[in-house]
């Protein structure tokens, strides 16, 4: 889930996936678990004390990413926007076709949410700030 990597308190991350080309089963479309956003966070990727990163297990592991676990393909046409709740389990498979599957991905978090200092995605010399902090 995106919340695993972009942790905020309270949870606020939303993913935006813009299909720049058709995304199909052949070229590696996204797959998602219907209702999976209602689950509690299972993991958190964070900076480890002393350097490096670690995956902290918080609860039950999310189901494996396959159709047998209930994941469904999100085949879409070029120009489609898929909005992903931060807790929604999703993935894509390898593109096994000769066609590209270009997409643009953007994540947004609430600028009033707390972004912990041990989140892996940040630079101490360039702190993450919300738009409201700009002067």
Question: What label would you give each PLM region?
Answer:
Residues 42-47, 81-83, 87-135:
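Non-heme Fe(II)/2-oxoglutarate
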